[in-house]
């Protein structure tokens, strides 16, 4: 789960990471009031879960409350890489002497934690990583030992911080590790971490990604979810405990097991090239069970997607046999009734496949086509979607 900047800022502050005062606002009038409260120069910052805000006009400096009001009017409602700005943060201004970069992330390739830090970093860290990769220190972090005071100083030296700054930045590095460790994060990034003209180290902008699988250990994490920004179909699927991700295609996908579903996406994409470029509309893994209730919930979500013009149900019977899956499909269609309006292509294989196919063929639902192989089923689903 990605956090908004203001949520990351509040999290940093709770762990003692130095941040600037900031106030969240939803309207231009609220921005004016926030600017008056903070006083002096403020920065009005769009709250969206994507990068490139500054270049898109989503970050503006204001010297007065009236200027902040005008800035907010230009930012609220702005589209930034497909994200509409509904909220801004009004942050106190700071005189910056130098920008740095610091992050901790989960290195999936090495199966460990990785710290990235740069004395020469900051907002242009991506360019620096390409043109001068030696300026970006990469330090593996032992998950058990973590980042203590000594390790924080080691990181600062590896990132070429001068000795006079190490005593200032090392405690910040250590506290950012606490955020990462104690909140079960997969990313904690500060870009930029700055040195102000008055000699303070400030986390000026932060990104935090929390591991949703660890949500049961953190009562406060549920409150950080942005229900308003969630895709309504994904929110609906989550209510039924379905593993669903909306895509931009026309063929709805239901399968059991993430690997099978991903393979199904591939074969549908390939088949779609022969039928006008149709593509998968979603990822939906119903897991090991395929009861009528689970299948109905999955179909209800997929059929609610206006882009979907056909559905491909691809199930390999293992612990759950194919006859149970077939009964689940029949029960789901009966349960949905008139809400089921789009053709279904069903491919079953594995445990008790003959009985599963017999159940579907005897039911002879007008929307259901039973196909023998995955390639044939993908081609049929793509053909129906393109019709």
Curated annotation (Swiss-Prot):
Binding-site residues for ATP, renumbered to this chain = 45, 52-54, 94, 99
Q: How is the cofactor bound?
A: Binds 1 Mg(2+) ion per subunit.
ATP-grasp domain mapped to chain residues: 9-236
Q: Which UniProt keywords apply?
A: ATP-binding, Ligase, Magnesium, Metal-binding, Nucleotide-binding, Tricarboxylic acid cycle
What enzyme class is recorded for this protein? ligase
Q: Which GO terms describe its cellular component?
A: cytosol; succinate-CoA ligase complex
Q: Which family does it belong to?
A: Belongs to the succinate/malate CoA ligase beta subunit family.
* Catalysed reaction equations from the record: succinate + ATP + CoA = succinyl-CoA + ADP + phosphate; GTP + succinate + CoA = succinyl-CoA + GDP + phosphate
Q: In which pathway does it act?
A: Carbohydrate metabolism; tricarboxylic acid cycle; succinate from succinyl-CoA (ligase route): step 1/1
Record-level Gene Ontology MF annotations:
ATP binding; magnesium ion binding; succinate-CoA ligase (ADP-forming) activity; succinate-CoA ligase (GDP-forming) activity
- Where, in this chain's numbering, is substrate bound? 256, 318-320
Q: Which PROSITE patterns match?
A: ATP_GRASP, SUCCINYL_COA_LIG_3
Q: Which organism does this record belong to?
A: Clavibacter michiganensis subsp. michiganensis (strain NCPPB 382)
Could you identify this protein by its name? Succinate--CoA ligase [ADP-forming] subunit beta
Sites binding Mg(2+) sit at: 191, 205
A Pfam family of the record is: Ligase_CoA
Query: This protein's superkingdom?
Result: Bacteria
One BP term from GO: tricarboxylic acid cycle
| UniProt lineage | Bacteria, Bacillati, Actinomycetota, Actinomycetes, Micrococcales
Protein purpose: Succinyl-CoA synthetase functions in the citric acid cycle (TCA), coupling the hydrolysis of succinyl-CoA to the synthesis of either ATP or GTP and thus represents the only step of substrate-level phosphorylation in the TCA. The beta subunit provides nucleotide specificity of the enzyme and binds the substrate succinate, while the binding sites for coenzyme A and phosphate are found in the alpha subunit.
State which Enzyme Commission number(s) the record gives: 6.2.1.5
Show the InterPro entries listed in the entry. ATP-grasp, ATP-grasp_succ-CoA_synth-type, ATP_grasp_subdomain_1, Succ-CoA_synthase_bsu_CS, SUCC_ACL_C, Succ_CoA_ligase-like_bsu, Succinyl-CoA_synth-like
* Description of how the protein assembles with itself and partners: Heterotetramer of two alpha and two beta subunits.
- Gene designation per UniProt: sucC
* PANTHER family for this protein: SUCCINATE--COA LIGASE [GDP-FORMING] SUBUNIT BETA, MITOCHONDRIAL (PTHR11815:SF10), SUCCINYL-COA SYNTHETASE BETA CHAIN (PTHR11815)
**So which cofactors does this thing need?**
Mg(2+)
């Amino acid at each position: 789960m990605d956090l908004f900047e203001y949520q990351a800022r509040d999290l940093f502050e709770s762990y003692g990471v130095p941040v600037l005062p900031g106030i969240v606002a939803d309207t231009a009038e609220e921005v004016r009031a926030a600017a008056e409260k903070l006083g002096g120069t403020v920065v009005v910052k769009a709250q969206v879960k994507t990068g490139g805000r500054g270049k898109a006009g989503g970050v503006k400096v204001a010297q007065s409350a009236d200027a902040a009001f005008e800035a907010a009017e230009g930012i609220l409602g702005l589209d930034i890489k497909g994200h509409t700005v509904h909220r801004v943060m009004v942050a106190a201004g700071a005189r910056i002497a130098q920008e740095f970069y610091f992050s901790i992330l989960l290195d999936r390739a090495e199966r460990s934690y990785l710290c990235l830090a740069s004395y020469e970093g900051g907002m242009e860290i991506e360019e620096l990583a390409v043109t001068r990769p030696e300026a970006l220190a990469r330090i593996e972090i032992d998950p058990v030992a973590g980042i203590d005071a000594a390790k924080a100083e080691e990181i600062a030296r590896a990132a070429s911080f001068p000795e006079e700054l190490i005593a200032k930045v090392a405690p910040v590095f250590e506290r950012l590790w606490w955020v990462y460790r104690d909140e079960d994060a997969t990313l904690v990034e500060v870009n930029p971490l700055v040195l102000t003209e008055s000699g303070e180290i400030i986390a000026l902008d932060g990104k935090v990604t929390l591991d949703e699988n660890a949500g049961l250990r953190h009562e406060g994490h549920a409150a950080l979810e942005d229900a308003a920004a969630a895709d309504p179909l994904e929110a609906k699927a989550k209510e039924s405990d379905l593993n669903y991700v909306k895509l931009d295609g026309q063929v709805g996908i239901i399968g059991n097991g993430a690997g099978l579903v991903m393979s199904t996406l591939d074969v549908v994409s390939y088949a779609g090239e022969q039928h006008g470029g149709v593509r998968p509309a979603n990822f939906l893994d119903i897991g090991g069970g395929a009861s009528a209730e689970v299948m109905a919930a999955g179909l209800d979500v997929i059929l609610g997607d206006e882009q979907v013009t056909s559905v491909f149900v691809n199930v390999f019977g293992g612990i759950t046999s194919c006859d149970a899956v077939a009964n689940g499909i029949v029960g789901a269609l009966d349960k949905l009734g008139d809400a089921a309006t789009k053709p279904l292509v069903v491919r079953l294989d594995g445990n008790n496949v003959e009985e599963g196919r017999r159940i579907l063929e005897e039911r002879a639902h007008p929307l259901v086509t039973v196909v023998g192989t995955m390639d044939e089923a993908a081609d049929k689903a793509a053909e129906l979607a393109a019709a």
